[in-house]
């Protein structure tokens, strides 16, 4: 029987069939649908992976360093010193600390450094697992997925440990639903302790963006659990285990690192504005502007622009405005490099913005970034509509975590839902966001299929979560929610939630009682 025969069928019944169970298959030759006739290794593998198959249901695929949602790594000519320092710390068998916390303000480049470390640790065969928290990404803001995701990666990084994890979960499939302390113990620590041969290389677990995890108490709890790991006698693989944690320097996170057990086993690195950071940002700018100048997308508009472009003085001015925050050059380069506009004109807009005094930058390092965000929003043709769409998307993404199973099932086009609930015409949302592509990622290609029985959505969009609309950086969300930073562009989440709730009630009156994708969407606000 072809194994794909029933792949796309549901509610299939087979009556009067005859099935033969083959326990012995000696002497079988040839191939069956491309699979070698000796099925023992395959059957053994299927049996072996029962526990891992259960565990995978609790894995946040987008949170891993190598997922399709992964963050960019550092430019190869930047952050060399800090990355080299951390790699040396990992590889030092005599190091006194087992936890490294590098922290910094929004936009300092923490995630890019963490991504680069993951890549290097994979090459060195040191990486056991990683988890990149994200407040507005599906399945990446909830700590319940943290240890199952890391454990699943660990099972493949160290196969002997993977066999133990598989057996443990197959014996007790409820482990991923238990308290985090039990998950850590059963899915990571005990399997590492049971390996017969102690690993000679470091075992590295990287947790990025802990401040993006839901709830201050949960963030503190995760840190306490990591600290408790090293209060126990080192056995087996745990002897070489180390954790790297990145976050903003939030007070409650900082407090955990100042008390035992973490205080005595943690090395801290702060990512602030230094001369080296400025040099790295200058390199980043130079490389990015060169790429824009030489891009085929700008061949006609840039062919007569002489290098170096822009001038060294302009780059120095932009470096000063960055105040050590890598998100600033990243946003500038996306804005200037937009293929729909002439790069020289876009750069002139930024250069002509009012200067910010050094004293203002000293007290408000994000002042230049805020000015840049405001400038980009001011260029939108329909400012109020743009803000409405932005805040509606923020509200829906904020509600996703409570309905993560439903969203994984239906995978709705959030932009079309926002248009409907805000009484806009189809396409108004895309048009409103067209001018701010440097701030918001809009998917270029969506695979769509008709949903004939749903009055809200005429189209159900089949895209992976990483292909959906997303904000390029969380600092833009912070800007929109802080009236002292965004001023006239500040958004009111409470007001928008009320508007969406009222629109949902009106819309749901037209639905049948069946659980369609649109009913799920509207139920977020009720």
Residue ranges and their predicted role:
Residues 1-497, 501-506:
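Conserved NB-ARC/NACHT P-loop NTPase core of NLR-like innate immune receptors
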Residues 503-526:
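Extended alpha-helical scaffolding segments used for macromolecular assembly and cargo binding
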